[in-house]
């Protein structure tokens, strides 16, 4: 007798072992038809999985997030099936699920073209309509490797040969195609109805640039056509908002091959940067942080003591001078500990909050670089709080409130919070972890925030809160973190004198709100589509003269506004006013101030707001008041 507990708490009993599909059928024909897989005692399995013991089971359908993952994984295999049918000489490698879709890497003697993608997608549709059953069999490692070598699939054989001999190997087949995979997969190809191939890109075998170059075909798959249409529309919008395009269009920054992963900020882009940095500086100062500055290059011995040299060296830029090894800092924390250690600290000094707009460098792979979003040189709005264990909750509450307020000010209202909990391998006692995790929970609760818990995802030295902001297109970006660290103060010898005169280690809270300034600016540019709020805009207004006779008035007006602390320029070129208006409209300037003879004589301005809104003619003082009101409403 096998007893199976369902999500509603009911228990079904079966005389003999049953498959997930059979359980679904016993519940109802509709569920049997909709079943894509099952969650057996928390593990995702195929509908063909046999249950021979008492267990809990949830039937997975296309209404579940896991169901969509199964569909995408199976569509990646369908892609490989179609490619092998159309291009038998192509060799298959790997095909995982990624955000919003999947990809599959192929080795082929010529590049795949857009026309090839159309043919492949059409063949995928034909194969899906055949509704061929997807079957699974478990074989030994040697049998699997031998099979793939016999059909000339050297990459698959190499993957299998790297797997421990004792491991079971799963092979999935549909039609004439067999692939190595951990699964699970849909029960038949007819479940795959909504998909599209997106693009081809280069990739290296096993992600190593020393290996052969492969071709990576990206695709997307969904349960409903409306969802796919919405996603494709979002991609169109994202392309229009691409910060790399807007950076060029708005003359904010550029990047070039002579300095890969580093940013050349232009005057307007640097003005935007300064607004963000000055705002963040004001907020951390108000929150009781002390701003410091630490060296960019430090001796190897410090990085060895912190553990970075042993565990992070390949991502660090290193140099040598006078027979000493140095590294450019990839992060600011070891330097902050040195400031804390400089002098005797008392419990009365705690909490001690150090902030730094710290310039860091990481040796990211060139293929991973992506505009401002993934760079090698970046500045973090970094800070470290040194406190006692009893102060963790209060400091976490204060940080949560600060972070949420900052995100709102920048126009982000939807924040997802995730709490990463203890991993299996960790330092510290269970009691210490209990207190640390519960402290972070209490801090989130005190702020009225909801969160998702991620068991096992914390660092080995402490739990962590992550802040994921959603932009105007619904995309999620992780920006802020609050990481509790029980290790670094010990490794680097940080201590304070407790109330009983004993020496104790402080708890260290690593925290950032925007994270990488470069990346955050990229997110801001895309979120606002380059049309920055007035308080952030590099140029808040441009004065445009219609003819030569208004040049002096236009210059005087711009200077008057600049003296009020406003970011205003004058465009005095001998061009048609319609041309100048169009140009500055494309630059997304919040206000255009047009002056002709009438405005000059009356000491007024004709004001056009962003979006082509005509605000009419008004005295200069009235416009200044309007702009100041925009700024006051933000503050």
Curated annotation (Swiss-Prot):
Source species: Burkholderia multivorans (strain ATCC 17616 / 249)
Protein name: Threonine--tRNA ligase
Subunit note: Homodimer.
E.C. no: 6.1.1.3
Molecular-function annotations in GO: ATP binding; metal ion binding; threonine-tRNA ligase activity; tRNA binding
Enzyme class, first EC level, given as a word: ligase
Function of the molecule: Catalyzes the attachment of threonine to tRNA(Thr) in a two-step reaction: L-threonine is first activated by ATP to form Thr-AMP and then transferred to the acceptor end of tRNA(Thr). Also edits incorrectly charged L-seryl-tRNA(Thr).
Record text on cofactor binding: Binds 1 zinc ion per subunit.
Domain TGS: residue ranges: 1-61
Reactions that this protein is recorded to catalyse: tRNA(Thr) + L-threonine + ATP = L-threonyl-tRNA(Thr) + AMP + diphosphate + H(+)
Cofactor dependence: Zn(2+)
Cited SMART domains: tRNA_SAD
InterPro entries to which the protein is assigned, alphabetical: aa-tRNA-synt_IIb, aa-tRNA-synth_II, aa-tRNA-synth_II/BPL/LPL, Anticodon-bd, Anticodon-bd_dom_sf, Beta-grasp_dom_sf, TGS, TGS-like
HAMAP family from the UniProt entry: Thr_tRNA_synth
UniProt cross-references to NCBIfam families, sorted A to Z: thrS
Lineage: Bacteria, Pseudomonadati, Pseudomonadota, Betaproteobacteria, Burkholderiales
Transmembrane segments: none
Covalent S-S links between cysteines: none
The family this protein is said to belong to: Belongs to the class-II aminoacyl-tRNA synthetase family.
Keywords: Aminoacyl-tRNA synthetase, ATP-binding, Cytoplasm, Ligase, Metal-binding, Nucleotide-binding, Protein biosynthesis, RNA-binding, tRNA-binding, Zinc
Intracellular or extracellular location(s): Cytoplasm
Pfam families, alphabetized: HGTP_anticodon, TGS, tRNA-synt_2b, tRNA_SAD
SUPFAM superfamilies per record: Class II aaRS ABD-related, Class II aaRS and biotin synthetases, TGS-like, ThrRS/AlaRS common domain
Domain of life: Bacteria
């Amino acid at each position: 007798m096998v007893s199976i507990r369902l999500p509603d708490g009911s228990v079904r009993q079966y005389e003999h072992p049953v498959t997930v599909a059979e359980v679904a059928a016993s519940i109802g024909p509709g569920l049997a038809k909709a079943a894509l897989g099952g969650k057996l005692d928390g593990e995702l399995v195929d509908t063909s999985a046999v249950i021979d013991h008492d267990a809990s089971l949830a039937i997975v359908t296309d209404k579940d997030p896991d169901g969509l993952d199964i569909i995408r994984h199976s569509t990646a295999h369908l892609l490989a099936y179609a490619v092998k049918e159309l291009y038998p000489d192509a060799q298959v490698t790997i095909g995982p699920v990624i955000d919003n879709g999947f990809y599959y890497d192929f080795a082929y003697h010529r590049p795949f073209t857009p026309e090839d993608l159309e043919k492949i997608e059409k063949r995928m549709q034909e194969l899906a309509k055949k509704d061929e059953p997807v079957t699974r069999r478990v074989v030994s490692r040697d049998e699997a490797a031998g099979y793939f070598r016999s059909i000339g699939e050297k990459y698959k054989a190499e993957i299998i040969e790297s797997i421990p001999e004792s491991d079971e190997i799963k092979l999935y087949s549909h039609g004439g195609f067999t692939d190595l995979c951990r699964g699970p997969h849909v029960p038949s190809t007819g479940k795959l109805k909504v998909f599209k191939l997106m693009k081809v890109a280069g990739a290296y075998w096993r992600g190593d640039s020393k290996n052969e170059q492969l071709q990576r075909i990206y695709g997307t798959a969904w349960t409903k056509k409306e969802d796919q249409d919405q996603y494709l529309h979002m991609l169109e919008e994202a392309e229009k908002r691409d910060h790399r395009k807007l950076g060029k269009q708005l003359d904010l920054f550029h990047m070039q091959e002579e300095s890969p992963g580093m940013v050349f900020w232009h005057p307007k882009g640097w003005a935007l940067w300064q607004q963000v940095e000055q705002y963040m500086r004001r907020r951390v100062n108000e929150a009781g942080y002390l701003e410091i500055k630490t060296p960019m290059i430090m001796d190897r011995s410090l990085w060895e003591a912190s553990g970075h040299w042993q565990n992070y060296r390949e991502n660090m830029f290193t140099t040598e001078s006078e027979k000493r090894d140095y590294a450019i800092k990839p992060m600011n924390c070891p330097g902050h500990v040195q400031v804390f250690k400089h002098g005797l600290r008392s419990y009365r000094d705690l909490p001690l909050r150090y902030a730094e707009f710290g310039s860091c460098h990481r040796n990211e792979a060139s293929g991973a670089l992506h505009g401002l979003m993934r760079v090698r040189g970046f500045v973090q709005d970094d800070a470290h709080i040194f406190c006692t264990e009893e102060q963790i909750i209060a400091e976490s509450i204060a940080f949560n409130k600060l972070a949420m307020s900052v995100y709102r000010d920048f126009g982000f209202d939807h924040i997802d919070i995730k709490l990463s909990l203890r991993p299996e391998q960790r330092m510290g006692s269970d009691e210490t972890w209990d207190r640390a995790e519960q402290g972070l929970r209490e801090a989130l609760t005190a702020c009225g925030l909801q969160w998702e818990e991620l068991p096992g995802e914390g660092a080995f030295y402490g739990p962590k809160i992550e802040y994921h902001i959603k932009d105007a297109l619904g995309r999620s970006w992780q920006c802020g973190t609050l990481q509790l660290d029980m290790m670094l103060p010990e490794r680097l010898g940080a201590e304070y004198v407790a109330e009983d005169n004993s020496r104790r280690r402080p708890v260290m809270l690593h925290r950032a709100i925007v994270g990488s300034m470069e990346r955050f600016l990229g997110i801001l540019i895309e979120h606002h589509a380059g049309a920055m709020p007035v308080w952030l805009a590099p140029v808040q207004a441009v004065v445009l003269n219609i003819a030569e006779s208004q040049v002096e008035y236009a210059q005087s007006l711009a200077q008057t506004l600049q003296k009020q602390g406003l970011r205003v320029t004058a465009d005095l070129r001998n061009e048609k006013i319609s041309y100048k208006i169009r140009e500055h409209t494309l630059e997304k300037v919040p206000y255009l101030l047009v002056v002709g003879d009438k405005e000059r004589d009356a000491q007024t301005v004709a004001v056009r707001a962003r979006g082509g809104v005509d605000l009419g003619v008004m005295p200069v003082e009235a416009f200044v008041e309007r702009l100041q009101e925009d700024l006051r409403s933000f503050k």
